Each structure stands twice: as C-alpha cells, then as structure tokens.
C-alpha cells in the first residue's frame, strides 16, 4: 500500500524536486528538463489527505516510467502517458495481492476500497480495471 513517505523517499533518492505551485492546471504536474524531474503540487486544488496521496502516487508513476507528454500533445499520446502512470501505480501500490487482502477483509465496494487504501475512488477504479481487463484477474468476495 502507498504511503506519502514512499513518494518523498523516491523523490529524494532520485533527486526529483517537489515544488508547491499555486495556479497549476492540475493538482499535480510532472515535468522533465534535460533529464531532471520535478513534481509540482497545487495545494489549492488538493482538498484532502486522500487526494494528496492519490496525486503523489500518480505523479510518482509518471516519474518512474518517464511517461510524460507536451501540453500540446494529441489526446492519444496524453492518454498513453496517463495509462502508463496508472499501470505503474497499480503494479507497485495497488497490487493484486493488496486487492485480495482487501476483499478478504470484506472491502468490496469501490468506496470501501478507497477508504481502505486511502486513495481516491478513481485511482482504485483504474487499478481494478487494469487487473481485471488487462491481466484477466478476478477478485471475488
């Protein structure tokens, strides 16, 4: 399971700058310049600890995979980058085993899983979709 410490430890170990930036177009944005990465966090758009965890986990997926795109990129390229970041997030922090443990503990609804993992429902949905549709794994109650 993801902890904010995972994000900050990774960023420190890989020399990724984490910069608060008000007025960004999204709660979190990752950029690369000459091989160096920075994650910008707009705390005016991050209204809860759960959302902060989700944003940091997702942006970590962008940094770890290098899945970035230009602002002017076509929609298909943007979606490909987002998919890669979401896939990395599922493979590292919302694993098949994590879901099996959650289901075994009685957490089966999307909102319950979001509470269990302390992540936004959309992140849980993305990971469940990845495991069920891409890896053909089913989670039963």
Language-model-detected regions and their locations in the chain:
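Active-site hotspot residues in diverse enzymes, especially metal/ion-binding acidic/histidine motifs
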Residues: 1-141
């Amino acid at each position: 399971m993801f902890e904010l410490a995972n994000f900050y430890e990774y960023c420190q170990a890989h020399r990724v700058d984490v910069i608060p930036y008000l007025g960004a177009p999204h709660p979190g944005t990752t950029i690369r310049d000459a091989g160096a990465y920075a994650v910008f966090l707009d705390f005016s758009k991050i209204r809860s600890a759960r959302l902060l965890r989700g944003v940091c986990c997702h942006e970590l997926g962008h940094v770890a995979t290098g899945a970035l795109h230009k602002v002017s990129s076509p929609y298909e390229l943007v979606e490909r980058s987002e998919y890669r970041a979401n896939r990395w997030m599922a493979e590292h922090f919302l694993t098949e085993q994590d879901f099996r443990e959650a289901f075994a503990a009685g957490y089966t609804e999307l909102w319950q899983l979001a509470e269990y993992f302390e992540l936004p429902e959309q992140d849980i949905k993305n990971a469940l979709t990845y495991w069920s549709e891409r890896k053909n794994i089913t989670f039963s109650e």
